[in-house]
Amino acid sequence: RVRFDKKVLRDFYSDRGFVDFEVISTTAELSRDRGSYFMTFNIQEGEQYRFGKVSFSSAIIDLDPKSFKTLLKFKPGNIYSPRVVDNQVKKIENKVRELNLDFIAIIPQIARNEEDRTLNINFSFEKSPPNYVDRINIKGNRVTRDYVIRRQFKSVEGDPFNPSEIRNSAARIRALGIFGDVNVSTRASNKVSSVIVDVEVEEQPTGSFGIGFTYSNDEGPGGTIKLSERNFLGRGQFLSFDLTSLSDANQVHINFLEPQFLNRNLALGLKLGSKTTSEQFSKYDSEVTEFEPSLSFPLSQKSTLKLKYRFSDETLTSKSTALSSAILSQMGSKKINTLGYVYDLDSKIDTIDPNENLSMKFSQDYSVGDSNFSYIKTKGLFRSHKTVFREEVSISAKLAFGHLAQVEGKSRVVDRFKTYTRQMRGFKGAGIGPRDRHSTSQDPLGGQYFAVAQLESDFPLMVPEEYKVRGTIFLDAGSVWGLDDRGGTSGVNQPGGLVDDKFHLRSTVGAGLMWRTPIGPLRFDFTKAIKKLSYDKPESFNFSISSKF
């Protein structure tokens, strides 16, 4: 364990330019109650280095190394990181393979400049001895099928031996998360110019059972039960059962995922679920049963595309006489068929700076129901995250938006957009947007458009680090607007019957505390609405907790 901690420290500092970092000594002291140890690491950081000049050289005829310059993802002056260099070598090796060039090694040659504390990098293209993969041996997998491990290798018996590809395969095996330890090594074969790849794995428990407790202003108290298996029947498949019960909603889901459908880089997902709500935002109840198969595949190293179909049986009921007529007219059952896709991009897989990340999700659904009813629903989410000031301060930004385009019929309140407290802080759930102010219960109608931007920073407070308390400040701005039917309870043709569905910007500022406790993370937010309308539902305090055991 101490050796592992030393490695973590070394990786942490070297990834931030401290190439001379070393652990000078470690000491262990027994606590007063003799129940634990205090570990002290005496370290020496050394100087921080940055990237200097970058060059390419080649001893191979007919190979122009300068053509690979466009692949560079770092610039002189960036903080040096061996991880960035390794990622750069992988990119160049991938390009070499695309050109069908075998037995070429890319060697990063590093020259240190002590005066300005920079490291000059030369990527040297050299001819490597021709070797081939003789065979791949796998052992230690008592539960997991051989093919689950073997399909992580892009190289098969008889292919040219590529050390980088073998390292990448080992990383993919570890990323499965079903083995406690993975060791991949190579040795010479009896055959000329051939190597044997040995894979030794250590099985670990892959099933889990969890019970959780949650509380938020929106949903009140709630409980969750989750059972999951990440290596179902040793096939590398994922199976889970989730049950969630809240004060005004209950849902149950069964999920199945086959990550290599038909032995291809194609993930097959199956989801079966049911959700019921009881006067969640207005005085009506809903019941939805759905089945959703999907296929996902990578478009690049950083992005995936999911194609999905969903069948849902949806029922809306109400016993209230005070419900808005704009909602009351939508009571009944519908069977909905939906075709859609989800595009997902995450830059953390391939970024120069480990302290920043950009992700994006974009989806569209085309839904068709009975009785001339259909719509197209579009949603997008952009996230950006960065740590500054020696990684002690975190800054994040988020932009979420959506549009409901009704093709046939009138839009329903359950299909329109509403905001939740965690999405638009400073307002209650469905606290902004079009509202039937002429109904007794002041029912929120939702909107066919929504957009919310959030900017947040969290930082350490002047308390001991072991208390695990951080402060946060944030700014939220957004709106929900647009209806294809603005008729309220009084009727569209009567005075006061129209619903205001125009775009009105709302904004809030706030500060809060985040506390990681033994029972789970607690969050306290204090907010003030800067811009709001008279009929909005603001709130000045929000508390949430999530606990698993």
Indicate residue ranges for each PLM-predicted region.
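Repeated loop/turn-to-beta-strand initiation elements of outer-membrane beta-barrel proteins
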Residues: 179-180, 207-209, 220, 232-239, ...
